[in-house]
Amino acid sequence: REKIGVMFGCFNYSTRVQLADGTTEKIGKIVNNKMDVEVLSYDPVADQVVPRKVVNWFNNGPAEQFLQFTVEKSGGNGRSQFAATPNHLIRTPAGWSEAGDLIAGDRVMASEPHRLSDQQFQVVLGSLMGDGNLSPNRRDRNGVRFRMGHGAKQGDYLQWKTDLLANIAHSAHENAKGARFVDFTPLPELAELQRAVYLGDGKKFLSEEYLKALTPLALAIWYMDDGGFTVRSKGLQQRTEGGSGRIEICVEAMSVGSRDRLRDYLRDTHGLDVRLRHAGAAGKAMLVFTTAASAKFQEIVAPYMAPSMEYKLLPRFRGQGTVAPQFVEPTERLVPARILDIHVKPHTRSMNRFDIEVEGNHNYFVDGVMVHNSPETTTGGKALKFYASVRIDVRRIETLKDGTDAVGNRTRAKIVKNKVSPP
């Protein structure tokens, strides 16, 4: 006896497929007209969204039902929408998952434009350690809003940072005290960073991976934002030639564990002798550098300092700033996007199921969401008389914390298939 081949799920006629030229087309029209088009597809080797040819077209007849998905996205009306059969495979951060196994609140992988250059990402990393912040988009859109703010005396410095991000849409405003703020358009590429840094306890959480990603530019921005420099000697005597001083940087906004990790990172990676102390009546956490470590740190960051902030450098390190804006063209990259709603789509005039086969990568995008090139059919072969198939769906419900440290996850397990029968 032969096993029958299995064909996976399909889409409703109106589901829009993203074409390589940036437009979209209904999958039903692509199939019915056997349109010779290129679609966007994810290449896992290159980690890029690339154009790929459609090489086969499928109209698989009527479906019993379609599940209508609504997923957050950054552009347009803030919604991605498509209708799939429950067995269609959709990409999630954990791998492929059947549409029927997903619930609202789960995340799927979507293609979103990435606008930040490597240099600009470092500006964000450094600012987050200092006076910058990331706030989630409260309108159920994908992407988070980056904000920088400084007092009236630091207007030139804020403008210097804004110029480094000038190609990102932004708005500026001033409060009654003269402090200035710059808000940038929500960026989907920063959503994961926001989730990693803000764990809900009001303090910023900096992981080992965050610290390893820092370049001297990010360290310079952190220092310019929150650092203070006290001159100990102006270098008038021969033994103090070049001057000396001591850096202190406020780390009160960081979690206790993050302060320790940052201190250890500066010691181990840059060989800087730094220690933590609590200053003043308020007991604010400060990172204190020795005079030798202060000079060494200033040597590292000097080429990345803003002209208006050179007073925080010893005279011998001034005038070295060489930072110029580096912009890049937007590229499509994968980011997690939250499912806002799933419901059974009401019956329509056409309940036919449509699918396409894509050259090479076997995936494509429907209204931005990555889905499997499903008419991969299993080839069949000799069947077992009986077989068992059990699948357990394990989901993370919440993160368990000990103080500020994540120590585990609370999970929910559900048997989603349990079958013992002749095929």
UniProtKB/Swiss-Prot annotation:
Sorted alphabetically, the Gene Ontology BP terms of this entry are:
DNA recombination; DNA repair; intein-mediated protein splicing; SOS response
* Gene3D superfamilies hit by this protein: Hedgehog/Intein (Hint) domain (2.170.16.10), Homing endonucleases (3.10.28.10), P-loop containing nucleotide triphosphate hydrolases (3.40.50.300)
Which modifications occur after translation, per UniProt?
This protein undergoes a protein self splicing that involves a post-translational excision of the intervening region (intein) followed by peptide ligation.
Q: Where in the cell is it found?
A: Cytoplasm
GO-annotated molecular function: ATP binding; ATP-dependent activity, acting on DNA; endonuclease activity; single-stranded DNA binding
The UniProt entry's GO CC annotations, sorted and at most eight, read: cytosol
Q: Which UniProt keywords apply?
A: ATP-binding, Autocatalytic cleavage, Cytoplasm, DNA damage, DNA recombination, DNA repair, DNA-binding, Nucleotide-binding, Protein splicing, SOS response
Tell me which domain of life the UniProt entry assigns to the organism this sequence originates from. Answer: Bacteria
**What role is this protein assigned?**
Can catalyze the hydrolysis of ATP in the presence of single-stranded DNA, the ATP-dependent uptake of single-stranded DNA by duplex DNA, and the ATP-dependent hybridization of homologous single-stranded DNAs. It interacts with LexA causing its activation and leading to its autocatalytic cleavage.
Family, as annotated = Belongs to the RecA family.
- The identity of this protein, by name, is Protein RecA
